[in-house]
Swiss-Prot record:
Pfam families: Pribosyl_synth, Pribosyltran_N
Family the entry assigns: Belongs to the ribose-phosphate pyrophosphokinase family. Class I subfamily.
Residue pairs linked by disulfide bridges in the UniProt entry: none
Annotated Mg(2+) 1 binding sites: 127
Protein name listed in UniProt: Ribose-phosphate pyrophosphokinase
Gene encoding the protein: prs
Length: 310
């Protein structure tokens, strides 16, 4: 097995390599004066089982091109199999037509990754599970649920907790954690009664006096989760915390979270933390490196990945 790290999240790639007791394959990603990307693999990969680690997070287009060009370099270098390890799959929120004459960008990205030379994909908490069907190659979608459930059990031991989905679409994700913890599930139903009227958040479930934990896959601007936390507190919750897999946290998200009722937001290191995230008092990271490493080992050994979540 060989591991190639692109530039979007090198610390995560190094942690994965360390967990597998393997060195990173020597490779370089450079940019010409006009910002074209040039990738060079400095070791022989002929006949090797190669894993390329690259999140397609901000800047999404640059990181996507790095991944595509690296895949092409490995394919042309006669690697036996190339797995694109994409902890955060950018463009996943564009998984359907949002209106007339609009693209399905997630499908386009899937096509590009396949055509560039990937033989399989390993990713984490896809925004929409059906994206796996956009690929004509195998896709292993890992879940943060076991990691989050263990952390919640440790941090909230002995407290009266309730798992909360911030919207109807996230119920299955939240229920998976509630089931692991044998606790109750609440749902926030967002409704706009008529045009021009502010969105109303209705809490379905009795959260009075309970420590509520919101579960989501992506936190971008933070607006939805901050509003959801405020709704929980307004309905009598003792506290509101958040667990979300992918901390995109764009723009003023960190400042928005800091001034919100969210007592603590827990994210994973699927996306490289910005300085604002590292300095934030109420944002913390859990590493997914051991989970990725074990999944990669199983793929290389041709053993079951799904049994990680049994």
């Amino acid at each position: 097995m060989k591991i190639v790290a692109c530039n979007s999240n090198r610390p995560l790639a190094e942690a994965v390599a360390a967990a597998l007791n393997l060195p990173l394959t020597k490779a370089s990603v450079r940019r010409f004066a006009d910002m074209e990307v040039f990738v060079e693999i400095h070791e022989n990969v002929r006949g090797e089982d190669v894993f390329v680690i690259q999140s397609t997070s901000y800047p999404a287009n640059d990181n996507l091109m790095e991944l595509l060009i690296t895949l092409d370099a490995l394919r042309r270098g006669s690697a036996r199999r190339v797995t694109a390890v994409i902890p955060y799959f950018g463009y996943a929120r564009q998984d359907r037509k949002s209106g007339p004459r609009t693209p399905i960008s997630a499908k386009l990205v899937a096509n590009l990754i396949t055509e560039a030379g990937a033989n399989r994909v390993l990713t984490m908490d896809l925004h929409a599970g059906q994206i796996q069907g956009f690929f004509d190659i195998p896709v292993d979608n890992l879940y943060a649920a076991p990691l989050f459930a263990r952390d919640i059990a440790e941090r909230f031991h002995g407290r009266d907790i309730m798992i909360v989905s911030p919207d109807v679409g996230g119920v299955l994700r939240a229920r998976a954690i509630a089931t692991r913890l044998n606790t109750d599930l609440a749902i926030i139903d967002k409704r706009r009664e008529r045009a021009g009227v502010s969105e109303v958040m209705n809490v379905i479930g009795d959260v009075e006096g309970r420590d509520c934990i919101l579960i989501d896959d992506i936190c971008d601007s933070g607006g939805t989760l901050c509003n959801a936390a405020a709704a929980l507190i307004a309905n009598g919750a003792a506290s509101a915390s958040v667990y979300t897999t992918h901390g995109v946290l764009s723009g003023g998200a960190v400042a928005r979270i800091a001034s919100s009722p969210i007592s603590m937001m827990t994210i994973t290191d699927s996306i490289l933390a910005t300085e604002a995230v590292r300095l934030a008092q109420n944002v913390r990271q859990l590493t997914i490196a051991p989970l990725l490493a074990e999944a990669m080992r199983r793929i290389s050994d041709e053993s079951s990945v799904s049994s990680l979540f049994d």
